[in-house]
Amino acid sequence: MPYVFLLSPQLEIASQWDGYYEKTFEVSDHVHKEIILKVSGQTVLITGSGSGLGRLMAFEFGKLGARLVLWDINEQGNKETLKELEAMGVEAKAYTVDLSEYKEINRTADLVKSEVGKVDILVNNAGIVTGKKLLQCPDELMVKTVSVNTNALFFTTKNFLPGMLESNKGHIVTIASMAGKCGVAGLVDYCASKHGAVGFNDSLASELYALKKDVKTTVVCPIYINTGMFDGIATKWPTLLPILSPEYVVDCIMEAVLTDRAFLAIPKFSYIFIALAGLLPTEVLNLYGDHFGITHSMDHFKGRQSRQA
């Protein structure tokens, strides 16, 4: 397999990253004060806040003095997030929302605007995965995957962006995936939906630039995360392609959002794959997929298919 020699420099670089995945979000005192001033008193709406990354992000924003608006289809999980935030002394309000239904998104957004007011930071985090190959995936599940992972972004953003434009400040965060930058067997609907999420963010950022408005965007593309959504998946080289801890991913996301980064891939090694995907022929990329175990990473998928998280 001659193409594997192309991997040797990257393998050498990656071998120097021992302990990288234990990184925590730390900033200097000066920057920390600026961040607190930026977030304190701001209203942050997070979709998929009933578990996983959404819940952890809610805690982190709450620690910085933000007011939280929690959206999730999982009412019980969302109530648990709300309870923990209130125990921390954080002002928060929870709403049960099915993000696959745009009319429900619009209805709940109107309720938020009347009960809470303007949203300053919108975190489009909710997502679902079926983990089924195209011919085995029921039509209704494919439709729901695209509805939650892609279509919902249009309607959440359309509802809360006008307030940001009026005040000439705000931030829209899209939690996408490395599946939005490549294709993976067993994730046809998920990859398509996340490519849509990446395209949504890129086009939105372009529109905001054209308007000369100071509303920021951040798109986040992590690999597999150990939140339950991808239970059962495995890669051949976990040092290079680890199953990431949600705590680590949230640390990276918070740093990116609070420092206004436009694009974040997690882990850093992912940037190499993004570059290679744009340079190498499909035959070579397939060899990489085999070598790293990506091609068959979904073969033993179990997952958690009943929630938006």
Curated annotation (Swiss-Prot):
Record keywords, A-Z: Lipid droplet, NAD, Oxidoreductase
GO molecular function: alcohol dehydrogenase (NAD+) activity; oxidoreductase activity, acting on the CH-OH group of donors, NAD or NADP as acceptor
Enzyme class: oxidoreductase
GO cellular component, one term: lipid droplet
Disulfide bonding pattern of the chain: none
Cited InterPro entries: NAD(P)-bd_dom_sf, Sc_DH/Rdtase_CS, SDR_fam
Origin superkingdom: Eukaryota
Family: Belongs to the short-chain dehydrogenases/reductases (SDR) family.
Stated name of the protein: Protein dhs-3
UniProt organism field: Caenorhabditis elegans
